[in-house]
Regions:
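Conserved NTP-binding catalytic cores of kinases and kinase-like/nucleotidyltransferase enzymes
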Residues: 1-65
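Carboxylate/His-rich catalytic cores and anion/metal-binding grooves
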Residues: 12-17, 86-87, 108
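A conserved helix-loop-beta module that forms one wall/lid of the active-site cleft
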Residues: 54-90
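Internal "kinase-insert"/substrate-recognition segments embedded within catalytic cores
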Residues: 74-78, 90-189
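Alpha-helical scaffolds flanking conserved acidic
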Residues: 182-191, 206-207, 218-220
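Conserved, well-ordered alpha-helix/loop/beta-strand core segments that scaffold catalytic motifs
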Residues: 193-195
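Catalytic activation segment of kinase domains across protein kinase-like and atypical kinase folds
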Residues: 199-236
């Protein structure tokens, strides 16, 4: 992290910390880079402390529109804004401003402090000699938010869910339990949304985020780094 200042919505400069964001070289290897900004705990913006400023891929709407539609569809997704980013008074062009998926993300949606799991199998998160399917191995997941006083290393809730996924292929009783943990209304809405925006970017290989709520005994997906493969055909 590097020290910096940012102009707040009230026009006043405030101390912040900033660093490059993302594992993929496309985020930081070129002139325009993706950034992560961390605010002071007592100087939050819209009840969020950490924001990601990411580079649009191709047309700006292909990243922005899916996140906007996710909220309308009732799918968990970070808030996104199209902003013009300035660094040292020089415009860097249009960026996506996204809230980070963390404890603040939960609080902003009136969700009790619970576990959020990150599933990635590419770039620095890639582990050798282990299969590529995230849903086959709990060791391929890490926590980005922790339930109350629970230990960060405790992933028993995730292990239970993944075990149910495997057992459900041959066991009706396990499938019945899985339907209570992974509710149809959560996962069907997630799948329908992916079909709507024509995206499979959240998959068993990468970009998976799960909210595990031990109080309710449920696990549901979060939209992360979604990309739409729709094309706009301009009419003459």
């Amino acid at each position: 992290w590097q020290k910096a200042h940012m102009i707040y919505p009230d026009g006043q400069p405030q101390k912040i910390k900033v660093r490059l964001n993302g594992d993929n070289p496309t985020n930081w290897a070129f002139h325009r880079k993706s950034w992560r900004v961390k605010l002071k705990k007592n100087r939050l913006i819209n009840n969020s402390r950490v924001f990601n400023y990411t580079l649009p891929q191709e047309e700006e709407w292909k990243n922005y529109l899916p996140n906007y539609l996710a909220k309308r569809a009732g799918v968990l997704a970070p808030k996104v804004n199209l902003v013009e980013l300035y660094i040292n008074d020089k415009s860097q062009g249009i960026y996506h401003e996204l809230e980070k998926i963390d404890e603040s993300f939960l609080r902003n949606r009136k969700i009790m402090p619970v576990n959020i799991y990150k599933g990635e199998w590419v770039n620095r998160d890639r582990k050798v000699i282990i299969g590529l399917d995230l849903f086959n191995n709990p060791a391929s997941w890490s926590k980005v938010a922790v339930l109350g006083l629970a230990r960060e290393s405790d992933s028993s809730d995730l292990e239970y869910f993944l075990e149910l996924v495997k057992l459900s292929e041959t066991s009706e009783s396990s499938f019945a339990r899985l339907k209570r943990v992974a509710r149809y209304e959560d996962w069907a809405r997630f799948a329908a949304f992916q079909t709507l925006v024509q995206s499979s970017h959240n998959s068993s290989l990468a970009n998976m985020r799960l909210v595990s709520d031990p109080w309710k005994g449920t696990i549901r997906p979060i939209i992360h780094d979604i990309k739409s493969f729709l094309s706009l055909q301009l009419q003459p």
